[in-house]
């Protein structure tokens, strides 16, 4: 445990976040996501919702503001405009952290993009479509407050 940090930020997750450079991507995945298949580095946070993990990650990592969307969710198959509850919760977390709303990718495009991610965090999220790709932004000298 460390002061001032979410207990969800395990040593492994902090190491990955610190090792990532500007433009690197990390996937926060639900329990149904084929995380082991797509992960070059796999971190497991069982029993924790994707929104809680997103909140913890955004407390220490800025999203990339040099791209249209620093966060991307998976579109609902057959209804690209649908907003599942897990995605609505993630959008609320993004807004709370002052981030732009997440964009979305078609399911197989999401899987393809996830395969190139720096790491995948397998959460305990049981709701469908609880997946998001985060693109790391620039950490400014003195922080991004």
What residues fall within each predicted segment?
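Long, hydrophobic N-terminal alpha-helical segment
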Residues: 1-44, 49
């Amino acid at each position: 445990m460390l002061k001032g940090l979410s207990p969800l930020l395990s040593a492994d997750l902090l190491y990955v976040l610190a090792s990532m450079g500007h433009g690197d991507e990390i996937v926060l995945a639900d329990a149904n996501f084929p995380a082991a298949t797509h992960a070059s580095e796999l971190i497991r946070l069982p029993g924790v919702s994707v929104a809680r993990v997103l909140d913890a990650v955004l407390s220490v990592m800025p999203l990339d503001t040099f791209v249209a969307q620093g966060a991307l969710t998976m579109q609902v198959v057959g209804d690209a405009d649908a907003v599942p509850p897990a995605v609505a919760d993630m959008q609320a977390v993004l807004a709370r952290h002052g981030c732009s709303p997440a964009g979305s990718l078609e399911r197989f495009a999401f899987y393809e993009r996830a395969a190139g991610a720096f790491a995948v965090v397998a959460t305990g999220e049981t709701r469908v479509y609880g997946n998001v790709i985060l693109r790391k932004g620039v950490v400014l000298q003195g922080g991004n407050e």
